[in-house]
Amino acid sequence: VGQWKRPWYFKKEESESMHQAVQRESKLTRQTAGIIDGSTLGKIEIKGKDALEFINLMYTNAFTKMKPMTSRYVLMLGEDGMIMDDGIICKINDKHFIATTTSSGAPKVLSHMEEFLQTEWPHLQVFLNSITEQFTTFNISGPKAREIISKVFTDIDFSNEKFPFMTFKIFDYKNTQARIMRASFTGELG
């Protein structure tokens, strides 16, 4: 995926076909939980006094009323008006955002943003930084995902009231800054 290598599936037995393995993994994820290494997803840090205005111009969504420490699914259009990429925007504050992109889309999204900053909105004070390689990403899905993750991050309350859908938290985990987001790509609670 992009410049990353990622397994397609894991065989349980040598005789198991790719189709059988994927069906087994999908069924188990829907019944219990599954994990995927999503580190290949692009991550772009957007900072500066005009960061909010910039993302309002770059994406199809409106971000003016978005609260800090919340996330939103986003679409980026190309100059032809067609969907160029999708991802999630995480708002730390009005001057600091993290944008995720598709795995193969990160370079073109960053280039697209930089081009518009230089040619269309050079007056905006915005700084972009690719942070894809700085963060490992794991997606844990399925009905037992919260139960599993609660055993790892025991200081975080994962209840709906304390950790609403499409919010995220930044915290220290074993002397390392970590981010955890509640989102859903498969239709469960997130």
Locate each region found by the language model.
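Glycine/proline-enriched, intrinsically flexible loops and inter-domain linkers
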Residues: 1-190
